[in-house]
C-alpha cells in the first residue's frame, strides 16, 4: 500500500477532517512510498523508533506524534535524534490524536469503557462520555478492578464519594480538567489518566470518586484497536508494541 493511501484510509475511518486538533493528524514524517510492515505504539518515543528499525518497519503509527501547537520549531537534542532515526531509515511516521480518542469503536474512550465493563450511555461534552457499571461497587473495589484491567494501580480519591459507584464519566489521558463538568452532570466517579493538585480538591468538595489510572495505561486501547483493525481489513503486517511508561 502507498503511504498516502494508508493515510487516507485511516483518516476516513477516524473521520479526522471533522475534528479540530492541536497536532497534525496523518502522515507527519514521510518515508518510503510503499508500506507493508508497520509498528504501532502509544507515543513516538526513541524506544519505539528503535524497535521499528530492529523489525524493519516501513512505518510507525502512534497516538502521540510530533509537531504540537506551541512546540519549539528548533530541531536539536531529543527531537533531532528521533527525526534522524526516521529519516535515516526511510520510515514513515503517522499520528492520530483526538480522532483516536473520540472514535466510537476504536477510540481510547470506547476501548477503556469496554475494558472496564462500562455501558456507554452518552456524552457530557465532546471527549467526555458517561455510562454505568453493570452493578454498583464500592470505590475501593473499583480501584482494584481498574488496577487488574490496566496493570497499574490508580491514584484514587474517594474521601467524600458515595458508598457505591455505578454512574461514571471518563476521559482517557490528560482529562483531569473535565472533573468539574462530570460533577455538575452528576456521576459517582470520574476516571482519567492524570491528576493535578486541584483535581483532588474538586473531587472532595463535589462528592465524587476520582481515579487517575495513567495517561499511557488509559490510552493503549485506541492504538491497539486500530492495529487490530488494520490487520483484519488490509494485507498489512501490523505489530503493536507497548513501551512501558508508569505515567
From Swiss-Prot:
Summary of the function given for this chain in its UniProt record: Provides significant protection from radiation damage and may be involved in the degradation of radiation-damaged nucleotides.
Example GO biological process: DNA repair
Protein name (database record): GTP cyclohydrolase 1 type 2 homolog
Listed InterPro entries: DUF34/NIF3, DUF34/NIF3_sf
Family label: Belongs to the GTP cyclohydrolase I type 2/NIF3 family.
UniProt-annotated binding residues for a divalent metal cation 2: 64, 215, 219
UniProt cross-references to Pfam families, sorted A to Z: DUF34_NIF3
Record organism: Escherichia coli (strain K12)
Binding site for a divalent metal cation 1: 63, 101, 219
